[in-house]
Structures are given as C-alpha cells and as structure tokens.
C-alpha cells in the first residue's frame, strides 16, 4: 500500500473519528514529501509549540515537539538546513528538545509581537540560503474571529505569538511552500477544510477551527504522528542512500530521548482538561510513551519492508 498505509497508521482513530479530515487530505503527505526532496538548496523551517496557561507549571504541551524533532533530525541527517521556530512561552521546551538532535539546527524564538514575527520573516526570506519550506506541527491558528483558541474555546491570544504571519498575511506574498500538520482542526493548515467538516466533525468547530491554510495538509490522530508520517513518506520516495540517512534516527529510542528532554528539562505537559491542569509527564495526548512507541515501530517496520521490496524489484 505504500504511503497510503502510512496515512492509515497515523490516522487511526484514538478518541475522535478524524476519518473525513483524513480522507480530505489523502495524497498530500506524499506530495509534501516530494516537494521537499525535489527542491534544490532546500531549507526547511519547522514551527511548533502549543502553550497551556493553566498547566502546572504553565508550559507547552508535549505534542508537536517529538514530531518536530524527528523531522528536524531526518532532514539534517540528509544535509538539509533546518530552522526550528517557536515563541517565548514555548521556548524552554522547544530548546530542550533541540539539544537532543544528532545534528545542529538553527533555533529562532520570537516575542509575542507581530513586529517580531515579521522581522523573522524578513530574515528567513533573505540570506545565502533562504527558506524554501515551512512546516507547522501542532501550532494553533487564529480562527475566523482572529483569535487562537484551545479545543474547548479558550482564547490563547495572550500566550501565543502570531507565527501564522509566516504562513499568511494580507498584502504579503509568501516565498516558501507551506505544510500544516494537526489533529484537532484548530492548527495552522486546517483552514483548507470544507465548511461541512468544520461544522460537523470538529468539536466547537464554528468557534475554534483554523482560518490559516497551507499548501499541503497532513492530518493525523496525534500531531507527532503526522511528523513521523512525513519522515516515513520522504524515506519512501527518496533514493536508497538518502532513505537510509533520513531513517538513521527514526527509532523509538530517539523518540524517548526527545520526550524526556521536553518533560524533564522543558517541563512540557500533558493531560490538560477544563477541570484538571496539565502537568509534566511522559505521555502525549493522554497516551503513554509506550503506546506511541508501538505506532512508531509499526511505521518503521512498514517503511523498511517497502524499501526492501523496492530494492528486490
């Protein structure tokens, strides 16, 4: 089944059926992978960080951080420059995860002001190797009211830099290809979803659903899995030697190291609910690390089998 099987694995129902969102985005995972690998002098930015004010302590959630790390590691291993981007409230956890990467990446942290984001945008579009692709993973988008919202409707404006301005801004012509990865409908990239899906499939969709689109949308049951899916898809369309480099650190052991850094050093949190604050813990979207490791292992086994079959044919 090739990359379609990857889409199936990362889109398996966990708590909420995302079937229609997944079907809407079918084929875009492969297209995004091919876009990155076919671009000469590629330079990929990765935007992440979803801040939870009522956590103890106030911190970003664990989801998105591991997916960012696996994408960054794979691309850097291939020799593609990577710039990881976040904002001040999420900076400690994002930085902590980048310290575990096998190769160095650039790290850009903005303040909460639009001016700071636009200044970064100008820098990314110039220089010796301008950005060619920008990936958002588990990064909240403003909704139609112009405000970013949590899944139950809380306004996140006071804790969220307008990093969506790297994807869309009136009277600005975007110079890079954009990819959005999300699981809940309120993340950057989900703005392409049809109104029917927003209204019927996303809890509080009329309030929280993303207004910011992306060229390619990757839908997964956990956002981290979408990042894993992109690594898998890139390996499956890459030549043999490039595939090996992309997969060199695509292992459960590395994933555990990324999550450990996020939690122990960065104080990233999970299990946030209206009536119970999130706390630092080794889980993502209320699933234990061991459960996530099983999914990563299945992806890796599928990719390895696909590449072995391709080699024999």
What do these predicted regions represent?
Residues 80, 171-178:
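A short helix->loop->beta-strand "cap" motif at the edges of active sites that frequently abuts
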Residues 43-45, 132-133:
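Structural motif
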Residues 185-313:
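C-terminal functional extensions of proteins
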Residues 94-170:
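An acidic, phosphate/nucleotide-engaging active-site surface
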Residues 1-43, 51:
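Positively charged, low-complexity intrinsically disordered leader regions
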Residues 49-52, 139-142, 184-185:
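Short glycine-rich anion-binding loops that position phosphate/pyrophosphate groups of nucleotides
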Residues 81-89:
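Short internal beta-strands
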Residues 58-79:
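Histidine-anchored nucleotide/phosphate-binding helix
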């Amino acid at each position: 089944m090739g990359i379609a099987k990857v889409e199936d694995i990362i889109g398996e129902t966990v708590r909420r059926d995302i079937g229609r969102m997944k079907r809407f985005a079918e084929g875009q995972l492969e297209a995004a992978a091919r876009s990155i690998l076919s671009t000469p002098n590629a330079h990929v930015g990765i935007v992440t960080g979803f801040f939870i004010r009522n956590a103890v302590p106030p911190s970003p959630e664990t989801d998105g951080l591991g997916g960012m790390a696996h994408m960054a590691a794979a691309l850097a291993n291939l020799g593609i420059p990577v710039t990881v981007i976040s904002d001040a409230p999420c900076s400690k956890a994002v930085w902590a995860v980048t310290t575990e990467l096998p190769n160095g990446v650039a790290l850009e942290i903005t303040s909460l002001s639009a001016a700071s984001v636009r200044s970064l945008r100008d820098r990314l579009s110039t220089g010796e190797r301008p950005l060619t692709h920008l990936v958002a993973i588990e990064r909240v988008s403003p909704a139609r009211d112009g405000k970013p919202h949590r899944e139950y409707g809380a306004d996140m404006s006071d804790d969220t830099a307008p990093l969506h301005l790297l994807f869309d801004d009136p009277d600005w012509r975007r110079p890079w290809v954009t990819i959005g990865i999300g699981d809940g409908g309120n993340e950057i990239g989900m703005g392409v979803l049809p109104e029917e899906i927003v209204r019927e499939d996303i809890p509080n969709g009329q309030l929280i659903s993303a207004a910011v689109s992306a060229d390619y949308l990757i839908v997964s049951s956990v956002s981290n899995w979408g990042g894993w899916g992109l690594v898998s898809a890139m390996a499956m369309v890459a030549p043999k030697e490039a595939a090996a480099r992309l997969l060199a650190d695509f292992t459960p052991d590395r994933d555990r190291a990324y999550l450990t850094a996020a939690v122990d050093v960065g104080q990233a949190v999970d299990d946030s609910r209206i009536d119970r604050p999130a706390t630092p813990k080794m889980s993502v979207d209320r699933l234990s690390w061991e459960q996530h490791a099983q999914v990563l292992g299945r992806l890796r086994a599928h990719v390895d089998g696909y590449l072995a079959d391709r080699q024999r044919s």
